C-alpha cells in the first residue's frame, strides 16, 4: 500500500534537488511533448503531478491562452513551479491529491508526466478522471512500467524477501486492461532506457534527490550489513564494467474519452 503522506513528505524534501537528478523524467517530458505539437488550442487544461514544472513549461508554451490548472500533492513542488513559470490570470496552482480532487469544471486536456506510478488503484484513477474530462477530451501521460528498477527489486528479494523499497510498477498490458469503454486508446508506446551508476548508494541518492524514495507504508530501514549485502548482490548480477545498471521502463499513452 502506498502511503500518500509519505509521498507528500518525500517529494517536499526532494523539491530543491529534483531538477538536478530528474534526467529520466525530463526525457519523458520531451517525448510526451512531441505528442502535443499538433494539438489545437483548447479552453481548460489540467496537469497532474506538475512537480517543479518540467512539463508545465511545455504546456504553457503550446497553450499560452488556455486556462491551465497545475496540480501536485506537494506544496513545495507547487511553489517551485509557480516560481518558475510565474503567476498569470489564466494559471491556477492547486495543492491536492488527484484521487481526492473534485473540480467544478470539466477539462479538454489532461496531462501527466511521470506521476501515475504513485497511484495504487489505476482503474479508480481513470474512472475518476472520466468524471471531469469533457466528451471527446484527451488524456496524455507518461509513467513508469513494470521493469523499472527490476534489478533493485530482485537484489532486495535475494537478500531478504521481506525487504521492499520499490513499489510494483504496472505493465502496458495491465494498464490497457484497467481502461474500460469510457476511453479509446489513440496511442501507446514503451521504451527501456538503461542508466549506469558507480554504486548502489549513488543510485539511491538519485532516487532520494527526486523525492521518489519508497512510499510503501511497510518499508523497513536498512541495516549496514543488509546494505553491504545489497551492493554485493546487485554487482553480482547487474554490473557493467565498474558500474551498476539500472533499467527505466517508460510508458506513453494518449486516451480519448468516448462520447
From Swiss-Prot:
GO terms under biological process: biotin biosynthetic process; methylation
E.C. no: 2.1.1.197
Reactions catalysed, as given in the entry: malonyl-[ACP] + S-adenosyl-L-methionine = malonyl-[ACP] methyl ester + S-adenosyl-L-homocysteine
Pathway in which the depicted protein is active: Cofactor biosynthesis; biotin biosynthesis
Pfam family, one: Methyltransf_23
One Gene Ontology term of the molecular function aspect: malonyl-CoA methyltransferase activity
Keywords: Biotin biosynthesis, Methyltransferase, Plasmid, S-adenosyl-L-methionine, Transferase
InterPro entries per UniProt: BioC (IPR011814), SAM-dependent_MTases_sf (IPR029063)
Task of the protein: Converts the free carboxyl group of a malonyl-thioester to its methyl ester by transfer of a methyl group from S-adenosyl-L-methionine (SAM). It allows to synthesize pimeloyl-ACP via the fatty acid synthetic pathway.
Family: Belongs to the methyltransferase superfamily.
Name of the featured protein: Malonyl-[acyl-carrier protein] O-methyltransferase 2
Organism encoding this protein: Ilyobacter polytropus (strain ATCC 51220 / DSM 2926 / LMG 16218 / CuHBu1)
Taxonomic lineage of the native organism: Bacteria, Fusobacteriati, Fusobacteriota, Fusobacteriia, Fusobacteriales
Gene label: bioC2
Amino acid at each position: 500500500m502506498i502511503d500518500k503522506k509519505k509521498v507528500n513528505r518525500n517529494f517536499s524534501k526532494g523539491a530543491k534537488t529534483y531538477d538536478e537528478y530528474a534526467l529520466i523524467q525530463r526525457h519523458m517530458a520531451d517525448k510526451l511533448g512531441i505528442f502535443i505539437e499538433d494539438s489545437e488550442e483548447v479552453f481548460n487544461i489540467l496537469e497532474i503531478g506538475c512537480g517543479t514544472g518540467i512539463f508545465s513549461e511545455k504546456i504553457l508554451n503550446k497553450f499560452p491562452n488556455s486556462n491551465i490548472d497545475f496540480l501536485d500533492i506537494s506544496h513545495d513542488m507547487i511553489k517551485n513551479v509557480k516560481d518558475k513559470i510565474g503567476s498569470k490570470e489564466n494559471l491556477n496552482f492547486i495543492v491536492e491529491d488527484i484521487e481526492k480532487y473534485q473540480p467544478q469544471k470539466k477539462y479538454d486536456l489532461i496531462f501527466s508526466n511521470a506521476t501515475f506510478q504513485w497511484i495504487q488503484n489505476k482503474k479508480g484513477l481513470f474512472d475518476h478522471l472520466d468524471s471531469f474530462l469533457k466528451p471527446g477530451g484527451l488524456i496524455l501521460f507518461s509513467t513508469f512500467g513494470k521493469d523499472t528498477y527490476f534489478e533493485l527489486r530482485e537484489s532486495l528479494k535475494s537478500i531478504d524477501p521481506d525487504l521492499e523499497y520499490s513499489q510494483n510498477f504496472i505493465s502496458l498490458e495491465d494498464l490497457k486492461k484497467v481502461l474500460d469503454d469510457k476511453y479509446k486508446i489513440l496511442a501507446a508506446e514503451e521504451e527501456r532506457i538503461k542508466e549506469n551508476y558507480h554504486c548502489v548508494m549513488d543510485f539511491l541518492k538519485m532516487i532520494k534527490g527526486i523525492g521518489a524514495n519508497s512510499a510503501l507504508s511497510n518499508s523497513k530501514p536498512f541495516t549496514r550489513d543488509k546494505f553491504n549485502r545489497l551492493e554485493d548482490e546487485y554487482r553480482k548480477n547487474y554490473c557493467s564494467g565498474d558500474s551498476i545498471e539500472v533499467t527505466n521502463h517508460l510508458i506513453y499513452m494518449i486516451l480519448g474519452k468516448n462520447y
